[in-house]
Amino acid sequence: MWKFFYLFALLFAFGIAGCGKKNDRSNQISVQPVKQEEPLPQDGEERYRATYVKAAQAFSRNDLDGALAALDLSDQAKPDQASNANLRGAIFTRKRDWAQAEAAFRQALKLQPDLPMAQFNLGEVLFLNNKYSDAREKFQNFLNSQPSNDLGLYKIYLCDLLSGNNAKADSFLSSLKPSPNSPIYYFAKAAEAFHRKDKEAATEFVTSAYRIYPPDANSTFADSLVEKGYLSGEQASAPQPEDKKLKSDELKTLLPPVDKADSKPKS
């Protein structure tokens, strides 16, 4: 989905061998050596890649300040890289610094207009700030290059639903059917029920999704409902007991194959 450089990390292992007689160490205190940072490569391209990897790793650990510091070094090594700007936007999104996040994603798209994830991420920032019309445009741009992406379809549906574009929202919702490949049907139904304040029905749709699909598949759809205050984080991530999960033979009956060609919202 996201066009990446293939990044290679060079790992060096240093071994220290003891010389001389074997000593009795039973009474000695073990001291852990201080871990030292490896020097950065001198070559600009290698330094750029190495520091980008450091930034991405820090982001995955939620070390956001460390990620920004590594990105600064990456920018110094090779300025004006769309991948750097996109990652910077993701960091500021996690910090909930919306202005800097939006600026970073727009910079990424200025540098590489066809970067799909920057389109999606910018749409997400606009969506989280209730700018549904602008968000829909960015999600549509993302879908133009990822036409079968259910998360993009779902985001466009939410923009229509929450902005009061009832005709498009209703049309898309009526086109959906349960699928073994994606929980979009259940979360779109849940969003519509939450929106009309039928919490009981909405919760049942969410519960059904978690009975059928893996947690990771559900979480990407549930996140939007959490951000909009419909679900708590605990509700969106709570695993279902094994005895409540559907078996594979039940899935075949419940989830007939569907053609998703008609599921794309009208632009």
Task: Explain the meaning of each model-derived region.
Residues 23-39, 196-267:
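Terminal, low-structured helical/coil segments at or just beyond the last alpha-helical repeat
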Residues 60-61, 94-95, 128-129, 162, ...:
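Register position in tetratricopeptide repeats
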Residues 141-164, 174-183, 194-217:
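TPR/TPR-like (Sel1-like) alpha-helical repeat modules
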Residues 86-87, 121, 155-156, 188:
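Canonical tetratricopeptide repeat
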Residues 84, 118, 152, 185-186, ...:
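TPR alpha-solenoid repeat register
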